[in-house]
């Protein structure tokens, strides 16, 4: 459900692994770009109750990949997570289908550079609360959650220029994040952080964000130990070309 920057990579990896993949996207324009590889791509509103009431067939897994974006604001963001993801979780529970909800490490409250794991305190802002609610409903329904760090890879490159205050930045390559979905499908009822082994240091001493900037003020270091214990390891490392760090 959702085939954007990360969801599209999940679909590609699953298809390459021999799975029958049916991406569900919100617009016909998005669907057209996927149908060359996935002929059964569907363009519809997967947040609506009618979609889930009418969805039939035998399914081995469901991935909710309508990931947070800076373009998703207000009611649309809330609908995506508080309604759409929750309906997906309820549907998966009723049909005993393994589910993975793709969330974000932005849900953590830590702001002073400390380490966080899956049990760390969570933020209370509106966007974080919406994702955490969807996470809780997913796990309660028997599904699993992947809290992904900042994504890069392909057409999305990391910025090298120093800006803003000193802080820690947690990232993960799109291909590595997509590989974690298989781990989550095999380990239902769990929450995992998906991040590279080494957070990046960014910003400058005494730096500040420009007035009106929407960039996060939080600084944290995200532990991926739980996911690594299940056999996952990042192949890529930010800033290291053709890297393989296991």
Model-derived regions: residue spans:
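N-terminal Rossmann NAD(P)H-binding glycine-rich loop of SDR-like oxidoreductase domains
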Residues: 1-17
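Conserved Rossmann-fold cofactor-binding substructure of NAD(P)-dependent oxidoreductases
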Residues: 36-59
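C-terminal amphipathic/interface module of NAD(P)-dependent oxidoreductases
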Residues: 40-44, 214-246
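NAD(P)-cofactor binding segment of oxidoreductase domains
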Residues: 57-100, 133
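Conserved Rossmann-fold NAD(P)-dependent oxidoreductase catalytic core, especially the SDR/UDP-sugar
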Residues: 86-125
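Conserved beta-loop-beta element that borders a ligand/cofactor-binding pocket
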Residues: 104, 133-154
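Alpha-helical substrate-binding/gating segment
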Residues: 153-154, 160, 167-192
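Mid/C-terminal beta-alpha module of Rossmann-like enzyme folds, strongest
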Residues: 178-225
